[in-house]
Amino acid sequence: MIDVNKFESMQIGLASSDKIRSWSYGEVKKPETINYRTLKPERDGLFDERIFGPTKDWECACGKYKRIRYKGIVCDRCGVEVTRSKVRRERMGHIELAAPVTHIWYFKGIPSRMGLVLDMSPRALEEVIYFASYVVIDPGDTALEKKQLMTEREYREKLDEYGNKFNAKMGAEAIKELLQDVDLEGEVAELKENLKSAQGQKRTRAIRRLDILDAFRKSGNRPDWMVMDAIPVIPPDLRPMVQLEGGRFATSDLNDLYRRVINRNNRLKRLLDLMAPNIIVQNEKRMLQEAVDALIDNGRRGRPVTGPGNRPLKSLSHMLKGKQGRFRQNLLGKRVDYSGRSVIDVGPTLKFYQCGLPREMALELFKPFVMHELVKRDMASNIKNAKRKIDRQDDDVWDVLEDVIKERPVLLNRAPTLHRLGIQAFEPILVDGKSIRLHPLACEAYNADFDGDQMAIHVPLSDEAQAEARMLMLAAHHILAPKDGKPIVTPSQDVVLGNYYLTLEQKNRLGEGMIFKDTNEVLMAYQTGHVHLHSRIGLSVADMANRPFTDDQRHKIMVTSVGKVMFNEIMPADFPYLNEPTTDNLMNGVPDKYFIDNGEDIHDYLAGAPVILPFKKGFLSDIIAQVFKVYKVQRTSDLLDDMKTLGYVQATHAGLTVGVADVPQLPEKQEIVDDAHKKVTTISKQFRRGLITDEERHARVIEIWNDAKDDIQQRLTDSFDPTNPISMMSDSGARGNISNFTQLAGMRGLMAAPNGGMMEVPVTSNFREGLSVMEMFMSTHGARKGMTDTALKTADSGYLTRRLVDVAQDVIIREEDCGTDRGLLIHSLREGNEMIEPLYDRLVGRCPMKTIVNPTTGEVMVAKNQLMDEQLAQAVVDAGVEEVTIRSVFTCNTKHGVCKKCYGRNMANGEEVEVGEAVGTVAAQSIGEPGTQLTMRNFHTGGVAGGEDITQGLPRIQEIFEARNPKAIATITEVTGEVIAVEENPAEHTREITVQGETDTRSYSVPYTSNIIVSEGDMIHRGEKITGGSVDPKQLIKVRDVLSTENYLLHEVQKVYRMQGIEIGDKHVEVMVRQMLRKVRVMDPGDTEILPGTLMDISEFTDRNHDTLISGGVPATCRPVLLGITKASLETNSFLSAASFQETTRVLTDASIRGKSDPLLGLKENVIIGKIVPAGTGMAKYRHMEPKTVGAVSENVYSISDIEAQMKQEETKE
C-alpha cells in the first residue's frame, strides 16, 4: 500500500490503450458472470478468478492449493494465483475492442473537446461517429477537402469519380486517424498568429481551440487517446453480485452494461471473420459505440439504457456524481466504527464537561478496551473468553468498564452540524436507561432540545485523537461562538427564570430593612425563615475583602436583596458585587447610590428608593462574557454549572404556574376594534367612489388593522403586573415575547395569505376568548405557510452553507505576517440614519495598519500591528476617532490563505489566531449557520402577519454571494463630478440625469418609475448610486477598484444580517468575499506564455509577470473578475475539490486533458485521498515536531490495533 501521507500532489491524465492493457490482469472474453449451478465464476467471464484473483483467501479455484503456505503459487490446473481475496477489489481486466470507439466525455461535453481539437462541429462529429456520414481523411489530389462530410450516396459517386485516389471513412476509426494527424505544435503556432488579427466570434473560437491544443501539448496527452481500442473492466468486488434469499441474484448495473459491450464486441468480431456485408458491420460497430457510451455515461446521448421496470442503469459516471456518488458518499463522508446513536435526554446534574452514556452502549463502544483490561487483570484467560464475558454481561464487567472510560473523552454530534460547535467532546459518565444525557447548557450550541432529538457518539481511539478531543474539543472550552465572539453558552428557559426570580426585589416583604454583618448571616436568616428571598436588606461589605469596593464604601452599609446575596455567592471572589443589571456595575463595581452611612435609617432610604430590576437573560450573558474575559475557560465553566444549579433550584422553589386567570382581559379592546371597523368602512366607500385605487385601499386597510393591533399591544404592556407569571417569563427572556401575549390577551391580527400577501379580514379574537370557525380557518393559512417556508428555506440555507464551505475550505492561517503595505479604511456602517454596525464592533480583535493617535492630545493610543482588545477599541471610539485603517483579509498578501496580523483575533477564544487555524471553514459556517435562523423566523409567529418575514434575507444573501444581477438594480455614475441636470423625457417615458466630470460628461437614462436619489447641484463620486436599489457589483468593479467592490459586498451582507438582529464578525464576510475576487482575466499576454482570456489566480499572475520582468520582457495585463461562490469553487486549483462539489464529469474531463496536478493544499482534497488535513495540528510545522521524553518512559498504552492483532493471533492458533 502507498502511504498517503508521503506524497505531495496527485495528477490525472488520459489513459492510452497500451496503458489500459498494462493495468489489466487478463482479457474478459465472455459475457458470463457465474455458473448458475456451482455459483463459481465462469472462465474468461466478468468474474473470472484467473484474471481477478481467488474468491476465497489463500485458495485456488479448483481447491488443489489451500492455506497460506502456498502463497504466490499459480495453480497448474485452474490457473488461479493463491493470494488474499482482497485483490478482487484492486485487479482490473480489459476488453479488446474489435473496432475503436470514442470516449463520450470528450465528444459530448460542452464545449466538445474533440470538436475543438479537430475544428469540427459537434453535429458533424456525431454523424461520423454514429455512421451517418463519411469524413474525408486524405483528399489526395482530388477536389475534395480534408474533414469534408459526405453521405453514403455522395461517397459512392466520388468513388466512381476518383476511384481510390482519396481516403474517406466513418466511425471512430476515422476520428482516430484525424486526431493522429493533428500537428499540435504547428496548429498552436498558427492559432497564435491568427489571434493577432482575429475579432469577435472568430477570436473567441480561436482562443478556445488554442487553450485545448496547448493543454494537450503541455500535458503530454495525445489527442488520439480520446479514442479507445481497449476498455478497462473494473475489479469485480466493486461491481458485486450477491445471492438473495429465494435463489435470485442482485447485481450491480455495471455488469449489465459490461455484458452488452462484450456481447456486441464478440458479435462484431464474428461478423468481421465472416467477411459480412459492410452495412451489417457498420450497424454492429455503431451498436458497440453506443454500448460503450452507456457504460461510461448512460443517458448522456439519446435515451438511457434501462433495466427491469424501466429504470435507467447506473453507469461509471453516475457512480461518481451527486450526493450518493463515490466522492460525497464514500470519500468525504464515511461511516465509522466505534460509534452509536440514541435519543438525548436532559442531564441537569452533570458538570459542563460531562455527558451521560448508557451502560449497554458504553460496553459495546469500549469493548476492545474492556477485553484487554479483563485479560490484564487476570479476570479472563484470553481475549476470546473476555469477549464471551462481555457478551454475557457478567457483573464484574461493569466495574472494569467504569475504570476504562475514565479520562477518555467521547465526541457527541447532532445533525445538522451547522457550525463547528455541532461536534464537541465530553467525559462520559455511565447512566442507566438507554438515552444519552446532555448538559442543558450545551443545547444552545447544538440547537438541541429534548423532544425526541437524537445524537451520535464517536470514540476517539489513538492517543493523539484523545489529546485533541480533550484539549481542543472539550465542551467546557467552547463558551464563545466563533461567529461573533459572544458567549453561545447562555442560560435559557428554567435557568433564566430561576435567576430572575432569585434577583427580584419587592417592597414590604418579610425582614425588609434588616441589617447583616456578613453573607453567612444573611443565608442563615433566610434558611431559618426570618427574611424573604425578595426582601431588601442592608449588608456590611467590610468582610468582603476581595471584592473591588472603594475605601469609602467599605465603611458603609450596602442596600441589596437576599436573592442577590445568594446570586453573588457563585461569582468569583474578586469579581465586582452585582447589585443592578447594568454594564457600569459589571465593569466598575456597585455605584455609590446603593450605600448608606452607618447610623442612617435604612427604612427611610428604602421608602424613597425605587425597586431595582432583576437580572434578565441578556445580563446573564454579559456576566458570562465578562467572567470569560477575566478568568478564562475553567472558572467560566464552573460559574455556568453553579448558575445552572442555582437557576433550577430557584425555579423549582418559585413554582411558577400559568392559568387562564393569568391572561388579563383588556376592557377597551372592543372599542379599538369597532373604531378600526369604522375606518375600514370609510376607506371602502372612498374606493367605491373611485377616489382611491384598489392597491391604495388594500394598503390602508392593512395599515388600519396593524395600528389597531399595536395600540392593543401597547395598552396590554402598560397594564401588565410585573409579578404576573406570564410577564415574568417574557420579561426574563425565559420564554415567549410580547407578540405571544398580544395573541393570548389582545387580538391575533392580520394573517398571511397563501400567495404571500395579507388577508384584509383580521382575526379580532384572541386565544383567551377563543376563535370563531371562520377565524380558525383563516389562521390555518398562515400556520401552513410558516411550516412550508421553514422546510424550503432550511434546505436553501443548508445548500448555501455547502457552497460557502466549498469556496473557502482552503483558506488557512499560513504565516505570522505577510508584510503587506495596504489596509482597509473603516468607519461605522450606516443605512440612512440607522446604525448598522458601530465602529467599536469593527475594531475589536483587529490590528491597525498605522499607529492610531488621539486627535485632540496627539498621544499614541494603539501601535501599528497591535491587536486591539475591547478596552483599546472603546478608548479609540471615545477619543472621537471616526475612521481607522486596519489590517484586513482583503489586503493580505499570503498565498492560499491569510496571515495572523491581517486576520486578527480568533473569535472563538478571544486570543490572537494561531497558524493552522482553518479560518475559511469557520467563516463559511459562521455565515451559513444563522442562515437557518433567517429562514426559521417565520416559524415562531405561527404565521401572524407583521411577524418578521425574511424574504429579503436569504435570497438577498444568495444574490450577493452568487454575484447575480440584483432584482432592483441601481444606476451608478461612472464619473466623479456634479449633477448638472435631471430632465424628463416624456416620449421615452424616462428621465435623463447628466453628470459633469472633470474631463467628460455622462448622461444616464432611467425609467420614470425608478426612485432618483440625487438632485441638481449634488457632487457625486464615481461608483455612487443615482437611483435607489442595489448596485450590481460587476458594474462597480469596472467603475471603481477591487477594494471598493469588496467593501460594498461586506457592507451589503452585514446589512442583511444586522437587520435581522444577527451579529457576524466582519472578518468572516471578508474571507468569503476575498475568495470571490481572487481571479483575474488576462487581457494582453505581453511576453508571457499565458493565453489571452485565461482565468487565473492573482498570485500566479503576479509570479508569472515577475519572472517575465526579470528576464526583460513585457508583462501581461489583466482585469479583476468577480465570481459567484459556485463558479469560484469550480475554478479552484484542486480538481479533486471541484469534482466533489458539482459538475463532476465536466471537471474531470477538463482536468484529465490538461494533465492537471492537484497540489493538495485545501482540506477537502486531503480528506478525499485519506491524508491528514493541512490545518490545525495537521500542519507540517506541527506534524514534524519531535516529542521530548520527560522522565521515565511509562508503560506502553495499548491501542486498538494491538487488541485486533491479538484476536487474529488467537483465531489462527485454533
From Swiss-Prot:
- Cofactors that this protein relies on: Mg(2+); Zn(2+)
GO function term, MF aspect, one: DNA-directed RNA polymerase activity
Report the EC code(s) recorded for this entry.
2.7.7.6
Q: What are the alphabetically sorted keywords of the record?
A: DNA-directed RNA polymerase, Magnesium, Metal-binding, Nucleotidyltransferase, Transcription, Transferase, Zinc
> Main EC class of this protein?
transferase
Q: Name one GO cellular component term.
A: DNA-directed RNA polymerase complex
So where does Zn(2+) 2 get bound?
A: 818, 892, 899, 902
Q: Where does Zn(2+) 1 bind?
A: 60, 62, 75, 78
Query: By its UniProt entry, which SMART domains does this protein fall under?
Result: RPOLA_N
Q: What family name appears in the similarity comment?
A: Belongs to the RNA polymerase beta' chain family.
Q: How does it assemble?
A: The RNAP catalytic core consists of 2 alpha, 1 beta, 1 beta' and 1 omega subunit. When a sigma factor is associated with the core the holoenzyme is formed, which can initiate transcription.
Quote the protein name from its UniProt record.
DNA-directed RNA polymerase subunit beta'
